[in-house]
A protein has these predicted regions:
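Polar/acidic, low-complexity leader/linker segments enriched in S/T/G and N/D
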Residues: 1-17, 204-210
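Short polybasic amphipathic segments
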Residues: 1-8, 193-194, 237-239, 336
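Short acidic, glycine-rich loop/turn motifs
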Residues: 7-11, 56-68, 242-246, 338-342
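An acidic/polar, Gly/Ser/Thr-rich interaction patch typically located in mid-to-C-terminal regions
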Residues: 20-47, 168, 217-384
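Extended Gly/Ser/Thr-rich low-complexity repeat segments
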Residues: 44-60, 104-114, 204-219, 329-337, ...
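Surface-exposed cap/loop segments at beta↔alpha junctions
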Residues: 50-149
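Short beta-strand-centered interaction patches in the first periplasmic/extracellular domains
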Residues: 70-72, 76-103, 141-236, 244, ...
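Generic alpha-helical secondary structure
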Residues: 118-123, 127, 163-170, 294, ...
Length: 384
């Protein structure tokens, strides 16, 4: 494996001499991370600087567009720390995020009020706020939206909060549409591209004709496996309160995700007063029709409920000698089948996170299938 380093202008700066360890985490619905530990050498100290871009070359298949261009995931260094242990060994630690974190450099302005699919909404907000249709100061340089397969989806009545975080809104629409995203780099052309996609169906009974991908210790393609089934954070019915009308009445809508009753009914409240019925379009004040506004509140409710679902997940350490190869037979975002005969469990789930660990010349791959449990920070944000 080789780690290459670039400037933000995608000018090649060199390759890392050697590393002690690398943790490379990619996520389907969220921003990935990395953590790298390397001995201090003149070359490493020169390259591992805050702000530089790193890419990982390990011989695995990357994203290739129809024009033959090769795009790969990359990360930006945001943290550098130098340590010296009791034996006098000096090491350099670098940490950072995959490039989709750049989306949070922008607030959405002007406000978007639009009816479309989640895929179209994501492309629209990216294009308007950091793409070709953004103002000259707000454009990301060397950046474009990569060609995409059209994904089937229902129409959504959407309105964002004024000056909403672009990254957070893209994440919300991606989760609602079951879409993955990232910003990729083209080293040869010195370009960046917004990548929006939907993983393949590789489940045991898929109807698309794809070769099934089944992870099980019985097939010797999994070394370790953990299973989690949690309803600790589960809600299935939400009340959404909108902004006050001129008569001070506040409309309330509900979203019912399960048609449950009795003890099975789990209710939650969401205040959506940040979604106003009136907004500015140029110099004109526009009033959203009540029926459209209520549909927007329901969209907010559906988005909120996405974070309150049952958490069912497998976390597996995949054997590097297995019959299934990462990025050849399966990839981040694909839906696969997990099977554990002894536990009596078989589920179809999406690969939502992949952790690649490189240490002492050895590689391990750990994949999360399904939804991982929310962190304490995520729970606090939800309560707020």
């Amino acid at each position: 494996m080789e780690i290459r380093v670039f400037s933000t202008e995608v000018e090649p700066l060199g390759a890392i001499d050697e590393i002690s360890s690398l943790l490379w985490v990619t996520k389907y619905f969220d921003v990935g991370t990395f953590s790298l530990l390397a001995p201090i050498t003149e070359n490493n100290s020169k390259l591992l600087k805050r702000g530089n871009i790193i890419t990982k070359h390990d011989g695995r298949r990357e994203v290739v567009t129809e024009d033959g261009k090769i795009w790969r995931r990359a990360a930006q260094i945001t943290y550098v720390h130098i340590t010296k242990d009791e034996n006098g060994l000096e090491q350099l630690e670098a940490q950072g995020y995959m490039l989709s974190r750049w989306l949070s450099k922008r607030c959405i302005t002007p406000q978007i009020v639009k009816t479309d699919t989640n895929q179209a909404l994501i492309n629209f907000m990216v294009e308007k706020n950091c793409g070709s249709q953004a103002g000259s100061r707000r454009k990301f340089q060397r950046f474009s939206i990569l060609p995409q397969e059209k994904v089937a989806g229902t129409l959504v009545e959407y309105a964002n909060v004024a000056y909403a975080d672009l990254g957070a809104e893209v994440k919300g629409r991606a989760q609602a549409g079951k879409l993955g995203y990232d910003i990729l780099i083209n080293e040869r052309e010195k370009l960046y591209g917004f990548y929006l996609y939907k993983g393949k169906d590789l489940t045991a009974k898929n109807l698309e004709g794809n070769t099934p991908c089944i992870f099980s210790r019985d097939f010797d393609n999994v070394d370790e496996q953990e299973y989690t089934d949690s309803i600790e954070n589960c809600k299935n019915f939400i009340y959404v309160q909108g902004a006050a009308e001129e008569n001070e009445a506040q409309p309330v809508v509900t979203v019912d995700a399960a048609e449950a009753s009795g003890l099975e009914l789990e209710e939650v409240f969401c205040e959506a007063t940040d979604i106003a019925r009136k907004y500015q379009e140029g110099e004109t004040e526009v009033t959203i029709p009540l029926s459209t506004y209520l549909a927007m509140l329901r969209t907010r409710g559906s988005t909120e409920l996405e974070g309150y679902g049952e958490a069912v997940s497998f976390t597996s350490t995949i054997s590097t000698n297995s019959n299934l190869k990462y990025k050849s037979d399966f990839d981040l975002g694909d839906r696969i089948t997990c099977k554990e005969v002894k536990w009596g469990i078989q589920i179809d789930a999406r690969i939502t996170e992949v952790l690649e660990t490189y240490q002492k010349g050895e590689e391990t791959i750990e994949a999360t299938f399904g939804d991982s449990l929310p962190t304490l920070l995520e729970q606090i944000k939800k309560v707020r």
